[in-house]
């Protein structure tokens, strides 16, 4: 910006310095000397002052005239045309604020006068109607009594009615004039209101509340609405309708005003809540909550699950009241409603048979039950939990037979959880094995007593002392050695010692003093569940307390339903089951998880409410866990190569087998390959399972189930890989082979022979020829070689020429001399070693 002094400015405008200083003082500027600097703003102030002094203010014109000219041509007969020119002229006048205020005041006075006139008119009409009604009533009463009417006494009573007659006679003329005047003022008032509202909107002023109040008061009056509209009003309304402003819209306007302060809301927060639910409770958009959390340094999405503390912090920071609720309130109310009252009675013990695979657990139970269960299991190994009760001479005993294979760890843990006594079966010729130790750990974790059954004592290699010694290392000491665990020698094949085993079990049960309340509602645990094609979800229940009856409404984990039918372990229908009785129930809405607790509830509404709550809670916990896992692994997986994944869709016959297989298959793999069970369920392979496998490039595995017609059609058309299994060993081995194939192969070098250079010869054809002695292995022609000098590789190439006594040789064995020509290498020295090798591809293993 150029610095200009008063003197320079005077020279520029060609005016004396004294006159310019005088004008600047008149404009209110502080300049008194010719050397002072004048800024651009001060120049503008001086210019405005000079313009105002010459009556030429720089303002907008008060009047604007717009002229519009339209020219058109009309054609008439005879090829003649007539030019038509239409000129329109509009004048817009800008009024001063004083004029607008005076006009508004005048309009308000006129409106009040019109309202007063209309009110007077209404009061006059009401008064006239009342007087006419009183006169009619008086005339009717006079006609009903003719004798008194002939007397002169009633005349004074009629005088008050006839007195206002002159006023009523003069009223119509004055009322018509007042109505016309009021109507004209009303039209003018409406136009002024519209103009005033437009001016207010342009200036951004607040609406005139007093006028709105008057309009609302006028709307409340019933008479103006009931009055018929005249022709002038209708035409006026039509004209205003074309302008977009109707009388009806004005009537329907309300005087609602936005709240001046923030609205404080009550927010209810449970253990977990999503961002969208929190935003809905606070009546704000989800994006606002997301933006607020980004400012706090926490990136979230609108569907992310927040914990209670974080949600409370957000709601309180935004100024809302927070009420924390516990998610267990519904569960607590359910627990309070389940009352186990009544007389307690002794119940039969629940005994779980555990041990290593092929140690004879099921065969021992077969002898006790006088049945052949082991023959029915695929491969002769138990793959399901079998639950059945046995009536003995000494009382009833309920047995749970658990699998011994390593994949069924969860099944054995559930068996120990639902049991009173554990029979640990150990083969006398095999000793303590890994699953035997695991069974001891499960029994100790559940706090149940052990009874050790040393099986297969009829075999020649049976050694009872070895079993006692190995179990004592695990903390299980025999009674003969001063411990508290009974050891019983049995033979499932011959039946030896079975009675002593049952006696030891019942003795332990008497010590435990097991009791139950048969008259109470049933309560138990899910031992196994499956999806039957004809009957739907079927769950094996071990009743632990109370009595379960057909028709009861039961809640089982996140599933519920009414017991439609009950079957015992032999498949026979029963009406009720008491404590320690295993039964199969039908009627649930899904297959519950093995290990879920079953309870009889009062009504279906309560069962559905709790089941839906548990499903939602499980889903929220699963989402939160998945999100946490993503955040934890985001830096660990960064920069690593993506693993090769074998996708599997797995269908099994029972829920326990599904869990066991998912756990076993998930543990396979390494840093390069992994197994992912993308779909799993109980029941046959359906069309939806085949579509899932097709979409995700997965393999279909059926464990003791088969595919339906729709699934088989898709498998054949698309060429999917579908396999059936009935032994868990086979499915695990096949998956291991598939993963091994995905690993590929490694290239390994095998050293075939080593030759030591004893002398060097020159050949015009091959260059330097090394005279060598084969000191190790065999040297082959046309194989890759390495030249080593002081055990350091100095060259790697190919053996081009191999001769023995001037004859070409394909191989030279150890201890023989030969001549070796190395391709493209002539720097061979005495003492070097030539190493001949081959590259072999070797399959990798897990």
Swiss-Prot record:
InterPro entries xref list: DNA-bd_dom_put_sf (IPR009061), EF-G-like_DII (IPR053905), IF2_assoc_dom_bac (IPR013575), IF2_II (IPR044145), IF2_N (IPR006847), P-loop_NTPase (IPR027417), Small_GTP-bd (IPR005225), T_Tr_GTP-bd_dom (IPR000795)
Residue stretches of biased makeup (Low complexity): 136-148, 158-176
Residues covered by region (G2): 380-384
Location of region: G1: 355-362
Keyword tags: Cytoplasm, GTP-binding, Initiation factor, Nucleotide-binding, Protein biosynthesis
Biased composition (Basic residues): 240-253
Region of interest called Disordered, as start-end residue ranges on this chain: 94-263
Cystine residue pairs: none
UniProt: GTP binding residues: 355-362, 401-405, 455-458
Region annotated G5, chain positions: 491-493
Ranges for domain tr-type G: 346-513
Region (G3): 401-404
Basic and acidic residues bias locations: 96-135, 177-206, 230-239
Gene Ontology CC entries for this record: cytosol
Family the UniProt entry places it in: Belongs to the TRAFAC class translation factor GTPase superfamily. Classic translation factor GTPase family. IF-2 subfamily.
Protein role: One of the essential components for the initiation of protein synthesis. Protects formylmethionyl-tRNA from spontaneous hydrolysis and promotes its binding to the 30S ribosomal subunits. Also involved in the hydrolysis of GTP during the formation of the 70S ribosomal complex.
NCBIfam families for this protein: IF-2 (TIGR00487), small_GTP (TIGR00231)
Matching PANTHER family: TR-TYPE G DOMAIN-CONTAINING PROTEIN (PTHR43381:SF5), TRANSLATION INITIATION FACTOR IF-2-RELATED (PTHR43381)
Protein name: Translation initiation factor IF-2
Organism: Pseudomonas putida (strain ATCC 47054 / DSM 6125 / CFBP 8728 / NCIMB 11950 / KT2440)
Gene assigned in the entry: infB
């Amino acid at each position: 910006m150029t610095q200009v002094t008063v003197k320079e400015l005077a020279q520029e405008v060609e005016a004396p310095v004294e006159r310019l200083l005088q004008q600047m003082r008149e404009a209110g500027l502080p300049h008194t000397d010719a050397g002072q600097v004048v800024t651009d703003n001060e120049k503008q102030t001086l210019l405005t002052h000079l313009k105002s002094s010459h009556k030429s203010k720089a303002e907008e014109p008060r009047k604007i005239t717009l002229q519009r000219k339209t020219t058109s041509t009309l054609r008439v007969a005879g090829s003649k045309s007539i030019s038509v020119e239409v000129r329109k002229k509009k004048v817009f006048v800008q009024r001063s604020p004083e004029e607008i205020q005076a006009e508004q005041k005048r309009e308000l006075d006129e409106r009040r006068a019109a309202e007063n006139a209309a009110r007077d008119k209404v009061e006059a009409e009401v008064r006239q109607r009342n007087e006419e009604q009183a006169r009619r009533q008086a005339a009717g009463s006079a006609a009903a009594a003719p004798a008194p009417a002939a007397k002169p006494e009633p005349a004074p009573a009629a005088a008050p009615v006839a007195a206002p007659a002159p006023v009523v006679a003069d009223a119509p003329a004055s009322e018509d004039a007042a109505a016309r005047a009021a109507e004209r003022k009303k039209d003018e008032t409406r136009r002024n209101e519209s103009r005033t509202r437009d001016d207010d909107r342009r200036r951004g002023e607040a609406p005139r509340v007093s006028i709105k109040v008057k309009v609302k008061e006028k709307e409340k009056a019933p008479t103006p609405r009931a009055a018929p509209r005249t022709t002038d009003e209708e035409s006026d309304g039509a004209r205003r309708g074309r302008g977009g402003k109707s009388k009806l819209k004005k009537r329907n306007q309300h005087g609602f005003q936005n709240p001046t302060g923030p609205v404080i809301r009550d927010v209810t927060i449970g253990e977990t809540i999503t961002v969208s639910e929190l935003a809905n409770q606070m009546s704000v958009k989800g994006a606002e909550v997301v933006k607020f959390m980004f400012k706090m340094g926490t990136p979230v999405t609108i569907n992310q699950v927040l914990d209670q503390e974080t949600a409370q912090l957000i709601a309180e920071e935004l100024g809302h009241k927070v009420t924390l609720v516990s998610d267990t309130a519904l569960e607590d109310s359910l627990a309070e409603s389940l009352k186990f009252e009544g007389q307690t009675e002794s119940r039969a013990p629940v005994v779980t048979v555990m041990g290593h695979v092929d140690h004879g657990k099921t065969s021992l139970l077969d002898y006790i039950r006088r049945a052949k269960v082991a023959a029915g299991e695929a491969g002769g190994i138990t793959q399901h939990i079998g639950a059945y009760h046995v009536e003995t001479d000494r009382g009833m005993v309920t047995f749970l037979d658990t699998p011994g294979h390593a994949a069924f760890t969860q099944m054995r843990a559930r068996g120990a959880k639902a049991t009173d006594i554990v029979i640990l079966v150990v083969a006398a010729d095999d000793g303590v094995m890994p699953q035997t130790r695991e069974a001891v750990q499960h029994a100790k974790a559940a706090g149940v007593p052990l009874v050790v059954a040393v099986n297969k004592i009829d075999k020649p290699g049976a050694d009872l002392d070895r079993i006692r010694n190995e179990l004592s290392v695990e903390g299980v000491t025999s009674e003969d050695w001063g411990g508290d665990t009974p050891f019983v020698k049995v033979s499932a094949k011959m039946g030896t010692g079975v009675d002593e085993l049952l006696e030891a079990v019942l003795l332990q049960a008497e010590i435990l003093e097991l009791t139950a309340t048969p008259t109470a509602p049933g309560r138990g645990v899910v031992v196994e569940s499956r999806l039957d094609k004809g009957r739907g979800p079927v769950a094996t229940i071990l009743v632990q307390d109370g009595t379960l009856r057909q028709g009861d409404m039961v809640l089982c984990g996140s599933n519920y339903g009414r017991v439609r039918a009950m079957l015992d372990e032999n498949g026979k229908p029963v009406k009720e089951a008491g404590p320690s009785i295993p039964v199969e129930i039908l009627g649930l809405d899904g297959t519950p998880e093995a290990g879920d607790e079953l309870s009889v509830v009062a009504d279906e509404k309560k069962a559905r409410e709790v089941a839906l709550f548990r499903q939602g809670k499980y889903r929220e916990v699963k989402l939160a866990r998945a999100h946490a896992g993503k955040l934890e692994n985001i830096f660990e997986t960064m920069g690593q190569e993506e693993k090769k994944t074998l996708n599997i869709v797995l269908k099994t016959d029972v829920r326990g087998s599904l869990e066991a297989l998912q756990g076993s298959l998930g543990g396979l793999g390494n840093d390069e390959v992994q197994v992912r069970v993308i779909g799993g369920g109980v029941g046959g392979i359906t069309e939806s399972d085949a579509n899932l496998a097709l979409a995700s490039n997965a393999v279909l595995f059926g464990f003791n189930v088969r595919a339906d017609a729709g699934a088989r059609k898709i498998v054949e058309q698309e060429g999917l890989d579908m396999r059936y299994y009935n032994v868990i060993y086979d499915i695990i081995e096949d998956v291991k082979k598939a993963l091994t194939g995905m690993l590929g192969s490694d290239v390994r070098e095998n050293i075939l022979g080593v030759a030591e250079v004893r002398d060097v010869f020159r050949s015009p054809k091959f260059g330097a020829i090394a005279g060598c002695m084969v000191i190790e292995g065999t040297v082959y022609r046309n194989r890759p070689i390495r030249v080593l000098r002081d055990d350091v590789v100095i060259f790697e190439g190919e053996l081009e020429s191999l001769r023995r006594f001037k004859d070409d040789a394909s191989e030279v064995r150890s201890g023989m001399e030969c001549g070796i020509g190395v391709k493209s290498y002539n720097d061979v020295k005495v003492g070097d070693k030539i190493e001949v090798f081959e590259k072999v591809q070797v399959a990798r293993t897990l």
